[in-house]
Each structure stands twice: as structure tokens, then as C-alpha cells.
Amino acid sequence: MLGSFCQRYPEIAIELEIANREKIVARLRDNEDDLYVMSHPPVDMDLVIRPFLSNEYVVVAPVAHRTVGRRLTLRELADESFLLREVGSGSRHIIDEHMLASGVHLKVRLSLASNEAIRELVSSGMGLAVLSRHALGEHPERDGLAILDVEGFPLKQPWSVVHLRNKVLSLPAQAFLDELLNSEPATSGPLPE
């Protein structure tokens, strides 16, 4: 999406900051940027929220893990060690909310700020993870990962483009917003979290 926009408008300089949800919300409160892409916008702010891409969170394991190919309950997940995104990330927020509502507590072995690091550690057998399907690419099995069949998953939380309701968007920001909302959605590929 960004690449096609930059090709269409080569004179527009883009500044892109990738951060976790906590930092993005702070930047949003301080009105530091034109637009924000996030999966879990805050509910306590007056925002314009425009979903533009479906986003599913799935449970992943190493391809040879004993749970691959079985239907699992959420309670069975409580027996596993998990590698999750750090507290403050949108992914972690969504996962924690879902597990709390389900009455299940996950054993978090390691919290990381990188989806790539989590993928690599899961494929090496260090534990399971919950990741956005976009973070897995088109063929997770090529990276030694399997998507598990777990009750209550996938968790669906769309990616949205967000700005303060009273924000007057610059012409370049409005052009990018229009491009984003009118483009064909990508089926895979990493997005910021």
C-alpha cells in the first residue's frame, strides 16, 4: 500500500514510525502525527476510526509440536509456555482481554517487541505464540510454523486507520487516507503493531 502511494506521489516525503500500541496512543493523545494504523484504537478518545484490512490472531506452534492437527480447548493452552508481544502492544492487549474474559491464564515464558523474533523462537521449539496472521506470511510452514486449531480462535480485530476527530488532515495525509481506503487489501505481509 505504501509503495504504490509513493510511486503515485513521488514528491511527498513520508515519515513512518513503527511503535507498539502504548506509544501510538501517547502520540495520538499529543496529536503528533496525521494518521495512525492500529488494530485496537483507544475507546476513551474522540476519534475517526476507519477499518481497512481484516486481521486475525492465531495460535502458532512449531510444525512438529504434539498439538498440531488436534482441536484444542482454551484450557489446554494453559498448560503450554507462550512467547507473546510485550505489554503495551496491541496484540498483547487483545490476547490478554480474550484470555481474561475466557478465564484462562497463559504461562508467558518470554515477552518480546518483535514478531520476527517470536516466529523464530517458536519454530525452534521454545513455546507457542499468538500472532497476527499477517505476521506469518503466506506459507508459515516454510518457516517451521503451524497454525493450531483452538476454540475461540482466530481472534478478529481489523487494522484501522485512525486520527483525532478534530484533526484537519494535510493534503498529503488525505491523499494517503483515500489511497488506503480505496486500495485492494493485501492478503498477507507484515503490518505494524
Where in this protein do the model-derived segments appear?
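Short beta-strand->loop
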Residues: 48-58, 133, 142-156
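Central regulatory/effector-binding core of bacterial HTH transcription factors
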Residues: 1-45, 105, 112-114
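Ligand-binding clefts/hinges and TM-proximal coupling segments of bilobed small-molecule sensing domains
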Residues: 88-104, 171-174, 178-193
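A ligand-binding cleft/hinge motif common to bilobed small-molecule-binding domains
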Residues: 22, 37-46, 97, 101, ...
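Hydrophobic residues within well-ordered alpha-helices
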Residues: 28-29, 77, 120-126, 161
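Flexible hinge/capping segments at coil-to-helix
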Residues: 46-82
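Residues embedded in well-ordered beta-strands
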Residues: 35, 51, 58-60, 81, ...
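A late-sequence structural motif
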Residues: 146-189
